[in-house]
């Protein structure tokens, strides 16, 4: 026990700092619109950040929002060399600003999830023999079998999704196996489409990377493995056993396992930095590269979620990040391997009717005023005297319902509510739906549960009070402007400290704490214990009577 305690202490950022001046870890984020980097010192302070914006800084690639939307409006790609050149640019900016690369102990990063990169046969040789005299993009120009990579916004693979679900026994069976039913943007379906439409490009690909493992490969000067967490967004990885599903691979394309390589735990050190960066920029030769992961898993690390915690991003869409011990895969949401604890899981749930719906009800029922909106929440009772509402002006995805549906305390549908009742019905309904669907994936509120709120509506204390009451847990607010980057730097420290043998929470305990915004009112748990089953039953009633729109 003593030895272990000592080993943990030796690996904490502070102990690392004592051994060497202002050492740091870098966190990278290869997102849809930009490449961003932060440097985090051993006290876990961010002391440097920079970015390259694709549309603005690399206009020659002709992207809008970092992407090309094709004529069919379904196919969406990004040029792989744009990502490579962005890395050249950002490292050049860091060098000219005097950034001291010699102090970098380790780096990790994040990539937009699901996107895929196809390395041409012979590319590994080019990667391993880079000349420090030239930028990357000049040396890697002929290394890719397709120049435009499918990304998460692509929805052109419906046929391949049907094929995959049919082959493994249906959508629920695929979800139990891989954590999600078949989604058009998921990598396995994109690979299947490439194999079917362009078998030559597929056969000329010696390695297929995710955006995350592609970026890590650039730093390694060799192919980086895919990590378990980002690998969970492919419809290919068995999330329980953490191996590729042979059944899924066989449906998608031949020889796929050798093109993907073996997946690794997300906190693995995958190697040391390529000599290219040592000679061109002055990185230390011992600088470690920790497996890159997806942007959502990296954000979970950046928000420092722990077991039982939940993060609620209240934006245009509302997104839930859950930490799960025992996942129950469903037809909705996504379950991934947890990026900071390989024994556990994380889940993502997306709700389309987010801030725009809140703003609409504010305009209709509170004369366009957030103050009046807040006043309505304060002047109405928890539980809204049994009045419940569903507000889906656009087709919701969790669950698939459209329209507004209001019910009184007797479960009778009514056509309208008074303004203040409408406002509380909206906010209570949005948060009850989140709790019900989270619990549907295996989430349970625990005594130590914290809720981390981010996004626009997290600035409204009265909305957060309802969130605390519905979940029966304290709500904290946290700044997440660079959470994927910062989370990647934290993950680099974690990998450096020993990865799986060390608790992530131990490594990041000195990071800035979130601030408490709301605690549940007395009696809240009794009120919502009665309302939640009613809300769930009414949701089922609406679902069963809803006419599915014609597709």
Swiss-Prot record:
Record carries keyword Cell membrane:
no
Q: Name one GO molecular function term.
A: D-xylulokinase activity
Tell me its EC number(s), please.
2.7.1.17
Q: Name one Pfam family in it.
A: FGGY_N
Residues binding substrate, per UniProt: 114, 185, 295-296
Q: Where does ATP bind?
A: 370, 456-457, 460
Keywords associated with the record: ATP-binding, Carbohydrate metabolism, Kinase, Nucleotide-binding, Transferase, Xylose metabolism
GO BP terms: D-glucuronate catabolic process to D-xylulose 5-phosphate; D-xylose metabolic process; xylulose metabolic process
InterPro entries, A to Z: ATPase_NBD, Carb_kinase_FGGY, D-XK_euk, FGGY_C, FGGY_N
The catalysed reaction is:
D-xylulose + ATP = D-xylulose 5-phosphate + ADP + H(+)
**Disulfide-bond pairs as recorded:** none
Keyword Nucleotide-binding carried by entry: yes
Give the first-level EC class, as a single word.
transferase
Q: Which family does it belong to?
A: Belongs to the FGGY kinase family.
In UniProt terms, what function does this protein have? Phosphorylates D-xylulose to produce D-xylulose 5-phosphate, a molecule that may play an important role in the regulation of glucose metabolism and lipogenesis.
Q: How does it assemble?
A: Monomer.
Entry protein name: Xylulose kinase
Task: Please report the organism this UniProt entry assigns to the protein.
Answer: Mus musculus (Mouse)
């Amino acid at each position: 026990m003593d030895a272990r305690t000592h080993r943990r202490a030796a690996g904490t950022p502070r102990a690392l700092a004592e051994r060497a001046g202002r050492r740091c870890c870098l966190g990278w984020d290869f997102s849809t619109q930009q490449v961003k980097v932060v440097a985090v010192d051993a006290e876990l302070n961010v002391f440097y950040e920079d970015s390259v914006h694709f549309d603005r800084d690399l206009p020659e690639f002709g992207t809008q929002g970092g992407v090309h939307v094709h004529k069919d409006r379904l196919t969406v790609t990004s040029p792989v060399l744009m990502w490579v050149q962005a890395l050249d640019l950002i490292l050049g900016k860091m060098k000219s600003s005097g950034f001291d690369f010699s102090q970098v102990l380790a780096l990790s990063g994040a990539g937009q999830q699901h996107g895929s990169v196809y390395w041409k046969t012979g590319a590994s040789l080019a990667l391993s023999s880079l000349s420090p005299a030239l930028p990357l993009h000049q040396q890697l120009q002929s290394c890719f079998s397709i120049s435009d990579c499918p990304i998460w916004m692509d929805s052109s693979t419906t046929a391949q999704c049907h094929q995959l679900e049919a082959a493994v026994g249906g959508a629920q069976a695929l979800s139990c196996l891989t954590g999600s039913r078949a989604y058009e943007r998921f990598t396995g379906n994109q690979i299947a489409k490439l194999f079917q439409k362009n078998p030559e490009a597929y056969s000329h690909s010696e390695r297929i990377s995710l955006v995350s493992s592609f970026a890590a490969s650039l730093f390694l000067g060799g192919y980086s493995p895919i990590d378990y967490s980002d690998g969970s967004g492919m419809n290919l990885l068995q999330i329980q056993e953490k191996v590729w599903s042979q059944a899924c691979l066989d449906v998608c394309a031949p020889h796929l396992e050798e093109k993907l390589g073996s997946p690794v735990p997300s906190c693995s050190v995958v190697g040391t930095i390529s000599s290219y960066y040592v000679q061109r920029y002055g990185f230390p030769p011992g600088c470690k590269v920790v497996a890159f992961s997806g942007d959502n898993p990296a954000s979970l690390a950046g928000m420092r979620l722990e077991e039982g915690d939940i993060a609620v991003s209240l934006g245009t869409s509302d997104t839930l990040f859950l930490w799960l011990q025992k996942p129950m895969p469903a037809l909705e949401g996504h379950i991934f391997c947890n990026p900071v604890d390989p024994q556990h899981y994380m889940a993502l749930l997306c709700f389309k009717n987010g801030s725009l719906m809140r703003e609409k009800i504010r305009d209709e029922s509170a004369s366009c005023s957030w103050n009046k909106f807040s006043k309505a929440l304060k002047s109405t009772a928890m539980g809204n005297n049994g009045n419940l509402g569903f507000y889906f002006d656009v087709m919701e995805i969790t669950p698939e319902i459209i329209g507004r549906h209001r019910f009184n305390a007797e479960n009778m549908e009514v056509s309208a509510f008074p303004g203040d009742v409408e406002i509380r019905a909206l906010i209570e309904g949005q948060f009850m739906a989140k709790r019900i669907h989270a619990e549907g994936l295996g989430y349970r509120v625990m005594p130590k549960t914290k809720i981390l709120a981010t996004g626009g509506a997290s600035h409204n204390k009265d909305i957060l009070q309802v969130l605390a009451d519905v979940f029966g847990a304290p709500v904290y607010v946290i700044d997440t402007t660079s959470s994927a980057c910062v989370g990647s730097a934290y993950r680099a420290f974690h990998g450096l400290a020993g990865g799986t043998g060390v608790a992530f929470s131990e490594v990041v305990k000195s990071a800035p704490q979130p601030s408490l915004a709301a605690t549940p009112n007395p009696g809240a748990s009794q009120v919502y214990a009665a309302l939640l089953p009613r809300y769930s039953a009414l949701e089922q009633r609406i679902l069963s009577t809803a006419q599915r729109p014609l597709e």
